[in-house]
């Protein structure tokens, strides 16, 4: 599951030398994810990375998430509650970067360091740890361009485009597909959700019987799209590329259903998030961006991601 190499990250780079030994029991770091790990392998991997690295460094890690990735108010309330309880550092994947900006400012003003993972925030000077999502989506678009002739009908299943992650993936796919002459017939959001991805794909197929490829901004939506394509008896004519390389998607690739997916490194997002905020808690500094990388997953390597 998510078999990217588990880097020792900042420790390997020498940026946390001696810190594990001085981390104190009362140090508490909150990891606020956009969605719960249960039912979503991506967030489960983020949580595992954060908790395991926290244990290695001797800090308490509390992992929280709103009920859904669109429940902005719940995430804000969770963070405000933890600030009131005296949390020492925050690792944040914001559901809505603009809406979360005030509570991030509040934390920083109170001396509580914050880093962003997975999704960039809007607060100046806060480090982002995660994927270059636009480049990753462009990589996915390139797979489609290499497979299909110019002018082919293609579609994009977007995530939540008010989030920087959703916008970057939508933009990267759009720009890449446009550049190679694909005919983008639909760009619709499935809000990162499998059931919504299925419903949106059904709607797209109704008006586009000659569809040849779809880029799904995450694997959940891609797997939903595959269900719709199966029901329409069109899976054999549509090239499906996802994003995240979660275990279900890897299995789908091996079954010749999903054609490929783009792997992130969610484990390292969680682990490096904890390491990085601990660096700030100890008075250290960070780079503005820490890129956790991407790789194409197809039948040649999908077994490594199950």
Predicted regions and their residues:
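A residue-level marker of the well-folded mature domains of exported/periplasmic proteins
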Residues: 3-6, 21-306
């Amino acid at each position: 599951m998510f078999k990217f190499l588990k880097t020792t990250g900042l420790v390997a780079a020498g940026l946390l030398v001696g810190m594990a030994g001085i981390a104190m029991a009362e140090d508490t770091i909150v990891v606020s994810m956009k969605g719960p790990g249960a039912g979503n392998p991506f967030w489960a991997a983020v949580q595992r990375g954060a908790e395991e690295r926290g244990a290695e460094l001797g800090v308490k890690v509390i992992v929280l998430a709103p009920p859904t990735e669109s429940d902005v108010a719940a995430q804000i309330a969770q963070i405000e509650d933890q600030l009131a309880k005296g949390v020492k550092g925050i690792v944040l994947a914001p559901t809505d970067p603009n809406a979360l900006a005030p509570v991030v400012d509040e934390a920083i003003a109170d001396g509580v360091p914050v880093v962003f993972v997975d999704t960039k925030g809007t607060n100046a000077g806060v480090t982002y740890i995660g994927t270059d999502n636009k480049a990753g989506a462009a990589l996915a678009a390139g797979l489609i361009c290499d497979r299909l002739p110019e002018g082919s009908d293609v579609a994009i299943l977007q995530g939540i485009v008010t989030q920087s992650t959703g916008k970057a993936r939508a933009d990267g796919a759009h720009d890449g597909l446009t550049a190679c002459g694909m005919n983008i017939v639909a760009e619709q959001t499935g809000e990162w959700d499998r059931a919504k991805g299925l419903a949106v794909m059904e709607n797209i197929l109704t008006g586009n019987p000659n569809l040849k490829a779809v880029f799904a901004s995450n694997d959940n939506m891609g797997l939903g799209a595959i269900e719709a394509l199966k029901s329409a008896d069109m899976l054999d004519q549509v090239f499906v590329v996802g994003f995240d390389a979660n275990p279900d998607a890897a299995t789908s690739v091996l079954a010749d259903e999903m054609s490929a997916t783009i792997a992130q490194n969610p484990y390292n997002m969680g682990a490096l998030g904890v390491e990085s905020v601990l660096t700030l808690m100890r008075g250290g500094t960070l780079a503005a961006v820490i890129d956790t990388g991407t790789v194409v997953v197809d039948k040649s390597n999908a077994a490594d991601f199950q």
